[in-house]
């Protein structure tokens, strides 16, 4: 306690008359880059929902940055100088367009729910400075924001927020709410960056038929004290945009200053199941097909392999001398990931699967080698197939899940990019129907869509269940098992093992080779150990798979 008080006194006296780097009260902190020296670079942006006069002109821009060793420690994103005029009383826009910032760099953190990091005091020597002072800005609408997680950013890395889109229309904005500098046991500097999301609309692209946009509008209406809307309003013409006003920029700072980003992709090691694959269940009822082409790899323990040749051209990967601390939540500093994209594509730990001779198991109790229920291609029979490995398995990871309320009174949850098979509720049942034909990311499922669901007790033709409501919930534990077919029944729902792309042949070949390569490397250097439940093959490789699926589409496999 005495140290904290002393630190605050020192910070106040040290920075009271010092110019620092800040976004000001009319732009939002949306990115944080860390140079190899440990110096943080704060990025500021002005989206269409913040920092504007109702006449379409910018509020005065009082962002300013500090130069350390000829390097500016912040920048302004190149945003429009003007937008369409708008009615300040319109319930779709925030009545408050400006934040209230502290006068000095006087805070050790910006933790309240209605604050973001408006500025970072100059760090003249990042390697020796342990205490960093911040200028916190308060903005009341942030009370309705959603926590997106914490990114761990080390030298040469960057975390980027910004606009979140649905159908190419912005509906939210990810911002930096808090930053904490830390030093690991090896003396390496890293920053823990809290990311939050608040509703943010472009009035020229408000389409209430898009669920995300409608939800965002209702959030803003609630913040402004207005009633919700539940239907698509008639489209009306907007006013002609006014001429652009002049951007007010401090002397020596250029709007849209470019920042060179060097990305270091650090991936966790993983281990493969060491026990031999169990035989298929005896006395299997009709409909079971022995998996083809799967050869269990026993007795190895690969770790630390980093696939080469798939790095985005914009980045120059460097050798990581010390492991980069893993980000403990949904954000990770990977430059090729879209803004706001979680890197977890999984089921929650409380999801249920039916295991042969084991009854229903929670997902966090499932193990490699278990035979789990799945529907055959046409959904006419329920069969059992083996779990080959884990794409993701992290019992302590906190993540956001899309939770569907179904018309049978049950719920079903998975992360927003994970695929689930969707059908139209009105289509007649048919033994010729391909139930794998329409895999859809959870974030794209709409109220009124139907899922395929297995009978609770009978091994016969699938049923359909309708989505009645959709919510975002936060749960602890992420699990993504890979079966020999690329799909399985989770909470009796026919779901894919994949995310982004449902190209099973491509992904299975890729991950099988990764396992083999890692196995050889691991066996050469380390002792074999058993690790049935700690495999995490997929971290960092989903982007590679998305590229491969573009090069080799699933239709050609």
Curated annotation (Swiss-Prot):
CDD domains found in the cross-reference section: Hint (cd00081)
Keyword Hydrolase carried by entry: yes
UniProt superkingdom: Eukaryota
GO cellular component, one term: extracellular region
SMART domains: HintC (SM00305), HintN (SM00306)
Signal peptide: 1-20
Site label Cleavage, positions: 345-346
Classification via PANTHER family: PROTEIN QUA-1-RELATED (PTHR46706:SF12)
Protein name as catalogued: Warthog protein 4
């Amino acid at each position: 306690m005495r140290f904290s008080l002393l630190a605050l006194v020192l910070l106040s006296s040290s920075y009271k008359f010092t110019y620092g780097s800040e976004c000001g009260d009319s732009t939002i902190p949306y990115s944080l880059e860390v140079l190899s020296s440990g110096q943080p670079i704060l990025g500021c942006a002005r989206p269409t929902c913040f920092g504007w006069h109702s006449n379409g002109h910018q509020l005065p821009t009082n962002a300013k940055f500090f130069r350390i060793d000829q390097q500016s420690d912040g920048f302004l994103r190149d945003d429009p100088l003007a937008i369409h005029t708008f009615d300040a009383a319109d319930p779709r826009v925030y009545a408050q367009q400006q934040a209230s910032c502290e006068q000095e760099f006087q805070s050790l953190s910006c933790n309240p729910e209605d604050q973001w990091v408006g500025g970072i005091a100059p760090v003249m020597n990042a390697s020796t400075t342990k205490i960093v002072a911040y200028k916190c800005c308060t903005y009341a609408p942030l009370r309705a924001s959603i926590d997106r997680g914490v990114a761990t950013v080390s030298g040469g890395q960057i975390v980027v927020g910004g606009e979140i889109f649905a159908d190419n229309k912005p509906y939210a904005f990810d911002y930096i709410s808090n930053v904490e500098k830390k030093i690991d046991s090896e003396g390496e500097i890293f920053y823990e960056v809290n990311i939050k999301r608040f509703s943010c609309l472009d009035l020229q692209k408000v389409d209430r038929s898009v669920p995300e946009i409608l939800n965002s509008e209702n959030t803003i209406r609630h913040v402004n004290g207005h009633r919700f809307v539940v239907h698509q309003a008639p489209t009306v013409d907007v006013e002609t945009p006014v001429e652009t006003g002049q951007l007010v920029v401090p002397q020596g700072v250029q709007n849209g200053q470019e920042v060179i980003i060097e990305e270091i992709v650090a991936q966790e090691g993983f281990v493969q199941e060491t026990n031999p694959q169990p035989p298929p269940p005896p006395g299997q009822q009709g409909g079971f097909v022995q998996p083809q082409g799967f050869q269990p790899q026993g007795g190895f323990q690969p770790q630390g392999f980093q696939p080469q040749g798939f790095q985005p051209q914009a980045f120059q990967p460097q050798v990581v001398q010390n492991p980069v601390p893993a980000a403990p939540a949904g954000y990770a500093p990977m430059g090729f990931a879209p803004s706001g994209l979680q890197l977890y594509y999984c089921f929650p730990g409380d999801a249920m699967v039916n295991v042969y001779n084991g009854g229903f198991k929670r997902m966090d109790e499932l193990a490699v080698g278990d035979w789990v229920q799945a529907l055959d291609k046409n959904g006419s029979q329920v069969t059992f197939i083996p779990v080959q490995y884990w794409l993701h398995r992290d019992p302590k990871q906190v993540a956001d899940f899309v939770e569907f309320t179904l018309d049978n009174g049950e719920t079903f949850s998975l992360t927003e990019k994970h695929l689930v098979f969707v059908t139209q509720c009105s289509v007649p049942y048919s033994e010729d129907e391909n139930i794998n034909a329409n895999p859809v990311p959870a974030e794209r499922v709409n109220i009124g869509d139907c899922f395929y669901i297995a009978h609770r007790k009978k091994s016969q033709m699938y049923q359909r269940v309708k989505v009645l409501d959709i919510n975002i919930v936060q749960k602890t534990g992420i699990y993504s098992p890979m079966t020999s077919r690329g799909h399985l029944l989770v909470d009796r729902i026919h779901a894919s093992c994949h995310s982004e792309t449902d190209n099973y042949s491509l992904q299975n070949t890729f991950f099988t080779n990764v396992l083999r390569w890692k196995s050889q490397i691991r066996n050469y250097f380390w002792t074999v150990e058993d690790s049935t439940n700690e495999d995490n093959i997929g971290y960092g490789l989903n982007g590679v798979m998305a590229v491969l699926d573009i090069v080799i589409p699933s239709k050609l496999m």
